[in-house]
């Protein structure tokens, strides 16, 4: 009598949007929230609310292709009852209370190239990190697929490398309660 093959758990379903135009802020929001909640139109509406009387909106690209700033990300999260907390790079990453954090959004320098030619320009790129079923993932919209970072040590290693390169900013996506209690920070 043969035994049935051992059932293997299926890999977790990880939501991951790929890069389109300069919409990395929209992709980072949706990736960190693990569903499509925001669109370019929704981000543009937030821009209009942030600068209602501005002819040239300072929160997005002049070309209308995205390139949203941190104010748009923070307002989008606030609209969902969430908060973005700036991580102070001077703090040791061991003080980051990851179980209290829904996800992370990083703002990284991104090289500009024209084919094989690298241009001496610096752009910024928004990247989401999120835990799904106990595994942290790099959900960079420029990646073909989510990149598993592993457990808390893996995400701390990734963050340390990103911060060591300089010009990296880290936002912690947390609930309002976690923000108000300050329990995203482990000081013990």
Curated annotation (Swiss-Prot):
Superkingdom in the source lineage: Eukaryota
GO BP of this protein: protein deubiquitination; proteolysis
Chief location bin: cytoplasm
Enzyme class: hydrolase
Reactions listed under catalytic activity: Thiol-dependent hydrolysis of ester, thioester, amide, peptide and isopeptide bonds formed by the C-terminal Gly of ubiquitin (a 76-residue protein attached to proteins as an intracellular targeting signal)
GO molecular function, one term: cysteine-type deubiquitinase activity
SMART domains registered for this protein in UniProt: Josephin
Gene3D superfamilies xrefs: 3.90.70.40
Josephin domain boundaries: 11-188
Subcellular location: Cytoplasm, Cytosol
Keywords: Cytoplasm, Hydrolase, Protease, Ubl conjugation pathway
GO cellular component: cytoplasm; cytosol
E.C. number: 3.4.19.12
Active-site residues (renumbered): 24 (nucleophile), 125 (proton acceptor)
Pfam families: Josephin
Main function: Cleaves 'Lys-63'-linked poly-ubiquitin chains, and with lesser efficiency 'Lys-48'-linked poly-ubiquitin chains (in vitro). May act as a deubiquitinating enzyme.
Name by which UniProt lists this protein: Josephin-2
Organism: Mus musculus (Mouse)
